[in-house]
């Protein structure tokens, strides 16, 4: 990890009282935060709300945004239907690697576990956090009649300390897996978004800017 990102990570750990000394886990929380905070009000969620838990397979963070609110339970899905009579949904999936290179096997694994997630089958070997998120997603699709403008959108963020170069092999892996996800007929759109080291630094700094008046 370069010295600039190291400094940002140290500040994040201090500011959010991250209570693990494991730098890999710290970076997972950091990646989850910068992705979600740049798409959703950072003051309206806690780091634990978007973590898939310790040693969850293949996916480090998931944010389920329903009607512009972060949803953290099945009951909140039901409440959103009750009070809004609609479901506008966006799934944000996050996987982070502290390494300085984008690896095809890791990206493939991220997609594989994302596809497994959307089989909607909780498993006792998964973390409680991941099982809870699977149940939330299942509740969303059970109530598909409330989709208002479109089916849910899926965005997959892969965060790494390397440099993104549009590598042909990686691009092939990504494109093939996107097609497989699209063929599930669950999503309005599927998008893969790489965060390389420069993007990580830029997006972290954006989280520190004052919120502009709307």
PLM feature segments, named:
Residues 1-214:
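N-terminal extension/subdomain marker
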